[in-house]
Amino acid sequence: MKKLLLSMALLMACTFTMAQRSVGTWSLIPKVGVNLANISNFDVIITGLSPDSQQDIVEQKSKYREGFIGGLDVQYQAVDQVAFSAGVFYSVQGMRFPPSETIDEAKVHYTSDDVQWKYDYLTLPLMAHVAVLPGLSFNAGVQMGYLLSAKGRASLSQFTVDKEGKAHYQTGEKGNLLYAYTEKYDNLSYSKRFDVSIPVGFSLEYSHVVLDARYIFGLTKINKYTQDSMKNKVFTFTVGYVFDL
């Protein structure tokens, strides 16, 4: 058993050692993955009346939303343990709010659902990769981003509730709901086009397949006119394939 475990360990070590490149090697690494994105200090206050007619103030904190990321890294092996890379990526970021409901003095219920902001960036990460174990590296650098679009949407509705707890929506002549609709917003003119952030994380390479996990925290405000310091914060998970040149 000990010989078997030792043989397996040696085999794994040899396999991961293959991920270490010769000094001077250039590599192309296409990657795709998913973002879990949020925006700091992007909170809202919703006021209404609670069922006992008391003032109801609800603070809604932004939540993480999923988004696509994909692009290409060009990597150079500078020394045995250190490589540098530059990349270009399309990155979908933003945030979302959980559903909410408030009640006014006339006992009309107002709900919001599917509230989210979608920020599409072209990002340029410049990274240093330091090998900590064969096949495993710690990565850190700086990332510049250019905002391509900034859009939001919210599904809104209002209704009354009878004594039996049944909801009633107002309808038009054709049976359509009068106060249940989706609003869309374009926030590009209120947003800063350029963004600077710091990405840090780890990557694991096995047989030219590389798994990368990063946390990206923004250094610059994304909004132009509000005093709150709203900044990007993103968890990024990608898978790529290394083509050595």
Where are these regions (language model features)?
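Bacterial Sec-dependent N-terminal signal peptides
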Residues: M1-K31, V239-L245
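N-terminal capping/interface segment
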Residues: K2-L6, L10, F68, L72-V82, ...
